Amino acid sequence: MKVIEGGFPAPNAKIAIVISRFNSFINESLLSGAIDTLKRHGQVSEDNITVVRCPGAVELPLVAQRVAKTGKYDAIVSLGTVIRGGTPHFDYVCSECNKGLAQVSLEYSLPVAFGVLTVDTIDQAIERAGTKAGNKGAEAALSALEMINVLSEIDS
């Protein structure tokens, strides 16, 4: 029986990080975690990491699609934070962001790691951006690295 499982090192990988500016006080911690993980665990050089900023989570899928369309990248890490408010807006933003990023991944057969926090409170966001609950940006970067290697193994 053959088992395909990807590791984390991907020293030649080219990674795009698409990140929303809205809630940047959280997102910058996610970005730091993602970059640190790509460099330490993935052995990815800083020259092979591109950061693309956009206004908010709703814009992430379009930016990810344009990045994927270039064919220059082996994976995309998406980062952002959506915090529930008093209206249904939260549900729409989270749903469309998630669906759009998944669509880009399937359309371009490219790993698009989901590092978008969808939380009820600012405290929950802070916990997931490098304190009690780890750093979800780092986790998304690990997912992207692993998927690069899994897909490479499948194709070989």
Curated annotation (Swiss-Prot):
It comes from the Bacteria. NCBIfam families: lumazine-synth, PRK00061.1-4. The keyword Cytoplasm does not apply. Forms an icosahedral capsid composed of 60 subunits, arranged as a dodecamer of pentamers. The keyword Cytoplasm does not apply. GO terms for molecular function: 6,7-dimethyl-8-ribityllumazine synthase activity. Its EC number is 2.5.1.78. HAMAP family: Lumazine_synth. Keywords: Riboflavin biosynthesis, Transferase. It is an enzyme of class 2 (transferase). CDD domains: Lumazine_synthase-I (cd09209). The active site is at H89 (proton donor). 5-amino-6-(D-ribitylamino)uracil binds at F22, A57, V58, E59, T81, V82, I83, F114. It catalyses: (2S)-2-hydroxy-3-oxobutyl phosphate + 5-amino-6-(D-ribitylamino)uracil = 6,7-dimethyl-8-(1-D-ribityl)lumazine + phosphate + 2 H2O + H(+). (2S)-2-hydroxy-3-oxobutyl phosphate binds at G86, T87, R128. Belongs to the DMRL synthase family. InterPro entries: LS, LS/RS, LS/RS_sf. GO terms for biological process: riboflavin biosynthetic process. Pathway: Cofactor biosynthesis; riboflavin biosynthesis; riboflavin from 2-hydroxy-3-oxobutyl phosphate and 5-amino-6-(D-ribitylamino)uracil: step 1/2. This is 6,7-dimethyl-8-ribityllumazine synthase. Catalyzes the formation of 6,7-dimethyl-8-ribityllumazine by condensation of 5-amino-6-(D-ribitylamino)uracil with 3,4-dihydroxy-2-butanone 4-phosphate. This is the penultimate step in the biosynthesis of riboflavin. The lineage of its organism: Bacteria, Pseudomonadati, Pseudomonadota, Gammaproteobacteria, Vibrionales. SUPFAM superfamilies: Lumazine synthase.
